[in-house]
Amino acid sequence: MARVTVQDAVEKIGNRFDLVLVAARRARQIQSGGKDALVPEENDKVTVIALREIEEGLITNQILDVRERQEQQAAEIQAVTAIAEGRR
């Protein structure tokens, strides 16, 4: 299990307050959103996994925003397609 230093993660995000927000958001995605971890889990808790992803530069607030926007657009397209097919 690799040791996570918060300072390395802070340097990737900018400040510790934003780090807490991004790490919590990502940990929730992994825990309940069905998102897969981008780093080996190694029996770590989701918060540690989120910090490791941030530390490695795999996750930022902008990346999370883009992913959520893409998922929302895909869901909207799917809903519109289902409605259009129902009218035929």
From Swiss-Prot:
Entry's Gene Ontology cellular component terms: DNA-directed RNA polymerase complex
Name under which the protein is recorded: DNA-directed RNA polymerase subunit omega
Annotated organism of origin: Yersinia pestis (strain Pestoides F)
Record-linked NCBIfam families: rpoZ
Keywords linked to the UniProt accession: DNA-directed RNA polymerase, Nucleotidyltransferase, Transcription, Transferase
EC number assigned by the record: 2.7.7.6
Record text on subunit structure and interactions: The RNAP catalytic core consists of 2 alpha, 1 beta, 1 beta' and 1 omega subunit. When a sigma factor is associated with the core the holoenzyme is formed, which can initiate transcription.
GO biological process: DNA-templated transcription
InterPro entries found in the cross-reference section: DNA-dir_RNA_pol_omega (IPR003716), Pol_omega/Rpo6/RPB6 (IPR006110), RPB6/omega-like_sf (IPR036161)
Transferase listed as a keyword: yes
SUPFAM superfamilies: RPB6/omega subunit-like
The protein's role, per its UniProt record: Promotes RNA polymerase assembly. Latches the N- and C-terminal regions of the beta' subunit thereby facilitating its interaction with the beta and alpha subunits.
Enzyme class: transferase
Similarity annotation: Belongs to the RNA polymerase subunit omega family.
Keyword Iron carried by entry: no
